[in-house]
């Protein structure tokens, strides 16, 4: 059997998507997480729930060396990939932090690590293979999400931004990383027409880990208030179960076998932000990201 790889598969959206795919019992499901014990326990629980072949693998997206190690191990395993979901993400709003590679954490984990991972795994993709980049409505100022509008400058500057430790800029860096996800999805679709590459907005989901860096009151609202709002579909608040089912559909359903270069809100194809269609920016991001993720020599 071929495999479906889902980064960040131990909880929330990634867990629910992996569980849905595993329930089909016709593909190996590989989930990743930073903590090996946790991801292996999650895989064991998912195998018991679904009867599917679920495998847990450690992957620290905060280290490009770890991304390369993971990709090499997967290639050595010889397991062809039907689909990859670039799902794992962080949102650092308190202060300015950096990865082991010296890159700003939100940009490095949400964009650069997945850019490198996909590039390294391309030789393992089956014909017509699918790649889904999990983005967010925060990338689009026209959606008025309350998050500061993304500010794309260059890949190099996003990796090493000016020193601004304010929560506002932390949220802006998150929105910008989600814009980069959409730009990358579109550029990858253009460069590899043999693949099916799309971006996905799961909606605002309570119960996920993205609010872990927020102040206590906001974390409380995330856990207690937002779940109630899922009862009002017009507000765009969705449960991880609902969005996970949609992501699983994009990854494996025959319905989307020929769909590429699109942006989905749930299962509905929609327009992304105006800036996300700027091919000049997409090329600069691609080329800059390739430089930033190349192995360092000397």
Language-model region placement:
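Rossmann-fold NAD(P)H-dependent dehydrogenase/reductase core
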Residues: 1-209, 295-296
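C-terminal helix-and-tail extensions that cap enzymatic domains
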Residues: 4, 19, 255-298
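Alpha-helical packing segments of well-folded alpha/beta enzyme cores
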Residues: 42, 180, 184, 243-246, ...
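Active-site-adjacent bridging/hinge elements
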Residues: 85-90, 221-222, 262-265
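Alpha-helical membrane-targeting segments
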Residues: 162-171, 204-242
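C-terminal helical subdomain
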Residues: 177, 226-269, 279
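C-terminal/domain-terminus segments
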Residues: 191, 199-201, 205, 210-211, ...
